[in-house]
Amino acid sequence: MKRIFSIVFLLVALLATVSAQYFPVDTARLNSAYKVLVSGNRTLETETEFLAAYPTTWLEFYMTYSFVDDENYDYSMCEMCCEHISTLFSLTKVSDTILCKKIVDLTVGMKETGECTSFFQDYLIGYILSEDKLVLDYLSKLKKGYQMEFWQFCWSTVTECGRAENFKKLYARNKRKYPEQMKMSRIAFQYFYDGINYPELFPYKDEEYNRKFENKDYKYNFDDYIDYGGD
């Protein structure tokens, strides 16, 4: 009897561990903090609580909001992803430097996986353009690999789009004051703008990409495509 009880206990503990892996943050705390903010109660304390509850790393973000094709999977957090993102970028009471650190740290290593990350990317680009000094000052303190991972996500797109204009604006404005950052940003843009597919399409399931890939005469001339506004 004791042996059976021990086996059952171990199975329950294992299932609890596996389940917890999907939600590495306290989702009850996060949702509660979100509801307080959307109710109109915006103070330093309520915004700090939301920021503290929100994922801090890309892995936490992915495990909290990712879509898993399983009928038994709880999609409640996946469905709240965009609302939580817009709330994160709307915080005004917390310290600018604290919010900046949270956003940059979260972005490092992030991958374009679909609607949720695309939504985050839209807000991120707007944030960088409005708070470029703050972002670049903090980013410059990180290891170069982390800096490149940050820029990689910023400019990752599956097609050509308005991101090119965002890049040109940021580059022209900061190329002299932050030359190293803009060098990395330029390299990341060169390789990741219109340079990826969503994970489910990787590596060569996109027909248009296949045609380009199979065409030996096709060459993407990056320097002709983008105008940096001078060196």
Where do the model's predicted regions map?
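Sec-dependent N-terminal signal peptides
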Residues: I4-L15
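Sec/Tat signal peptide C-region and signal peptidase I cleavage site
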Residues: A16-A20
